C-alpha cells in the first residue's frame, strides 16, 4: 500500500516510515477514517498514545484540511461553505434523492478565470486551484458525519479539467484503501479543455464526462463562453467522438436554457444537426437541458426560464431521436443550483 505523497495519506505514510513505525500503522489510520469514521487523531485508540500525540503535533487535531464556515439547508439539499488555505472559500452541495441516493457536487477551484457570462463563480476570477486534499475533504467531511457517498460530480466552483490536482483526487476517490468508489460513480463537467479530455480518455475511461455546450453556434458560444475561441466546438466534439470510440461510454451534453438567447427552436434544430453528424449519429450523446438559475452575481443577467420554450426545445430533440432530459433543479432558494455557487458570499465580502 503506497499513497500519493501529494495527499495527506501519503504524507502520513512518509511520517510513519521516517519514525520507523510498522507498516500496518497506515492501514490502522485509514481504517479509522474510512471504516470507523473517526476524524480526530486523539480518538484513534488503536494507535499508541505517543503516536497519536506525534500525529496531532505534525498534522493537527483532525484529519480534515478544510474548515466548516456555514451551512444552508433546503428541501433535499445542503450547501456547505468551507474555508481552505490562504483564507479562501469554496462551496459544496449535498443532494439527497427520495430513493435514498446521496450525490455530492464538489468544487475544484476557488473561483474560475474562464468568464462564462451566466455563471456567478466566474465573475470573481480564479483565486486558487484547490489541492488534492481540499478537493477530497469536501466529500470526507460528509463521510465522517455518516453520509452515504453514492456519487460525486465535479460541477461545483471552477473548471475541473483546468486543475491537475483533480486527477490526483480521482485516484484517491477510487483507491480501494480510501474512498473505494467505482469510477462510474464519478462525473466531471468541462467547458472543453481538450488536453485534459484526452487524459481522461487515456487514464480514466470509466469516469463520466459532461461537456458544457450552451450554444451550437460557434460565434455565439464564444460570446457566452470565451474558451470557445481557444477550443472551438468542432474541435471539442471531435475529441469527444474519439472518447466515445475508445471507451464506448456515453458523453453528456449540458445546455443551459438562457431565455431569448439560446432557447429558440432554431437553436434546438442546430443542436440536432450538430449531434447527428457525430460518431454513430450521436447515439452515445445525452443532452441535459438545464433551466437558467438567476443570480445577481453573474456577469450578465437573464430572465427566468420559459417553461413552454424549454418543453418545445425538448420535443425537437426528442422527436429527432436525440437522448435528452430536462434536469430537475434543487436548491435554487439557497443559491445551490447550477451557476449560482459563491455568488452571495462574494457580494457580502
Swiss-Prot record:
GO molecular-function term, one example from the UniProt record: metal ion binding
Location of the active site: 91, 338
Protein's name according to its UniProt entry: Ribosomal RNA large subunit methyltransferase Cfr
Matches recorded under InterPro entries: Aldolase_TIM (IPR013785), Methyltransferase_A (IPR040072), rRNA_lsu_MeTfrase_Cfr (IPR022881), rRNA_lsu_MTrfase_RlmN/Cfr (IPR004383), rSAM (IPR007197)
Annotated localization: Cytoplasm
Outcome following mutation: residue 119 to A: Loss of activity
Radical SAM core domain sequence ranges: 98-333
Note on how the cofactor is bound: Binds 1 [4Fe-4S] cluster. The cluster is coordinated with 3 cysteines and an exchangeable S-adenosyl-L-methionine.
Entry function: Specifically methylates position 8 of adenine 2503 in 23S rRNA. Can also methylate position 2 of A2503 after the primary methylation at position 8 is complete, to form 2,8-dimethyladenosine; however, C8 is its preferred target. Confers resistance to several classes of antibiotics such as phenicols, lincosamides, oxazolidinones, pleuromutilins, and streptogramin A. The antibiotic resistance conferred by Cfr is provided by methylation at the 8 position and is independent of methylation at the 2 position of A2503.
Amino acid at each position: 500500500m503506497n499513497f500519493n505523497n501529494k495527499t495527506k495519506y501519503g504524507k502520513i505514510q512518509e511520517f510513519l516510515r521516517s519514525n520507523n513505525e510498522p507498516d500496518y500503522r497506515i492501514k490502522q489510520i485509514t481504517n479509522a477514517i474510512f471504516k470507523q469514521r473517526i476524524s480526530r487523531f486523539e480518538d484513534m485508540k488503536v494507535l499508541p498514545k505517543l503516536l497519536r500525540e506525534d500525529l496531532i503535533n505534525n498534522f493537527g487535531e483532525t484529519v480534515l484540511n478544510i474548515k466548516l464556515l456555514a451551512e444552508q439547508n433546503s428541501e433535499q439539499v445542503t450547501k456547505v461553505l468551507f474555508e481552505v488555505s490562504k483564507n479562501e472559500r469554496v462551496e459544496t452541495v449535498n443532494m439527497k434523492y427520495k430513493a435514498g441516493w446521496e450525490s455530492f457536487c464538489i468544487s475544484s477551484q476557488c473561483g474560475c478565470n474562464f468568464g462564462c457570462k451566466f455563471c456567478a463563480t466566474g465573475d470573481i476570477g480564479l483565486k486558487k486551484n484547490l489541492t488534492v486534499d481540499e478537493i477530497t475533504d469536501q466529500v470526507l467531511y460528509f463521510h465522517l458525519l455518516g453520509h452515504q457517498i453514492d456519487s460525486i460530480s465535479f460541477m461545483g466552483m471552477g473548471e475541473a479539467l483546468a486543475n491537475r490536482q483533480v486527477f490526483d483526487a480521482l485516484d484517491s476517490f477510487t483507491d480501494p484503501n480510501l474512498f473505494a468508489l467505482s469510477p462510474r460513480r464519478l462525473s466531471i463537467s468541462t467547458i472543453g479543455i481538450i488536453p485534459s479530455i484526452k487524459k481522461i480518455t487515456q487514464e480514466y475511461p470509466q469516469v463520466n464526462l459532461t461537456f458544457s455546450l450552451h450554444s451550437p453556434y460557434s460565434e455565439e458560444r464564444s460570446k457566452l463562453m470565451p474558451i470557445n475561441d481557444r477550443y472551438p466546438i468542432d474541435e471539442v466534439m471531435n475529441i469527444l467522438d474519439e472518447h466515445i470510440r475508445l471507451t464506448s461510454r456515453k458523453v453528456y451534453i449540458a445546455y443551459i436554457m438562457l431565455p431569448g438567447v439560446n432557447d429558440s427552436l432554431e437553436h434546438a434544430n442546430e443542436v440536432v444537426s450538430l449531434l447527428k453528424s457525430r460518431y454513430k449519429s450521436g447515439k452515445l450523446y445525452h443532452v441535459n437541458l438545464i433551466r437558467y438559475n438567476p443570480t445577481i452575481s453573474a456577469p450578465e443577467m437573464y430572465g427566468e426560464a420559459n417553461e413552454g420554450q424549454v418543453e418545445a426545445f425538448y420535443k425537437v430533440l426528442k422527436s429527432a431521436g436525440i437522448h435528452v432530459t430536462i434536469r430537475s433543479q434543487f436548491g435554487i432558494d439557497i443559491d445551490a443550483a447550477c451557476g449560482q455557487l459563491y455568488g452571495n458570499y462574494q457580494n457580502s465580502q
